[in-house]
């Protein structure tokens, strides 16, 4: 819940209501078959760093959970750090960020690295420490996923380098960046 008072006594209240549900399978996300195959091939690597970027509300977290569903097997240990946990999945170890209690993305990432993960998903790469830990984790044999609030893949690289990432380590770690937008679709009952 967010409230925003303004001059003149007008106040807006925004509520984000999250429905618990299953992740959407990759084949139902609306990717073209070619792009879906490329994503599946890229995220099937044993280690590296993969980002999903786009504006607020573009489905970044939904896409990441679809990817995790694709990779989720009984012998794969997957840890997620989310603010908040929006989609729950059986077999995932999901941790909710709680800034008031001092539980932030960087702290949780450090804990994950001691928990022998195969795959780590960080809901959002907000600061240099979190991004650095993601790069380090990917270079030490983990598959790491995260989101960025940027409008394009090239803009994501610029943002990460501006945060102070070492260009050589970052280049070694990066598997790919998926930039996405939600596109309005008419239902099948509509006619032009």
List each language-model region with its residue ranges.
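Short, flexible helix-loop junctions that flank or precede catalytic/ligand sites
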Residues: 1-192
């Amino acid at each position: 819940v967010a409230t925003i008072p303004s001059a003149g006594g007008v106040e807006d209240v925004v509520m984000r209501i999250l429905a618990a549900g299953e992740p959407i399978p990759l084949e139902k996300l609306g990717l073209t078959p070619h792009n879906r195959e490329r994503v599946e091939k890229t995220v099937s690597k044993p280690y590296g760093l993969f980002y999903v970027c786009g504006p607020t509300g573009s489905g970044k977290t939904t896409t990441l959970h679809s990817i995790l569903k694709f990779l989720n097997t009984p012998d794969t240990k997957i840890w997620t750090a989310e603010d908040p946990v929006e989609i729950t999945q059986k077999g995932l170890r999901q941790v909710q960020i709680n800034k008031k209690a001092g539980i932030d993305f960087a702290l949780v990432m450090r804990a994950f690295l001691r928990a022998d993960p195969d795959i780590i998903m960080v809901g959002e790469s907000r600061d240099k420490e979190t991004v650095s830990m993601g790069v380090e984790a990917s270079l030490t044999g983990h598959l790491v996923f995260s989101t960025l609030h940027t409008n394009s893949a090239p803009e994501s690289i610029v943002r990460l380098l501006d945060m102070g990432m070492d260009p050589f380590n970052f280049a070694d770690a990066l598997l790919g960046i998926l930039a996405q937008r939600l596109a309005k679709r008419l239902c099948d009952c509509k006619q032009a």
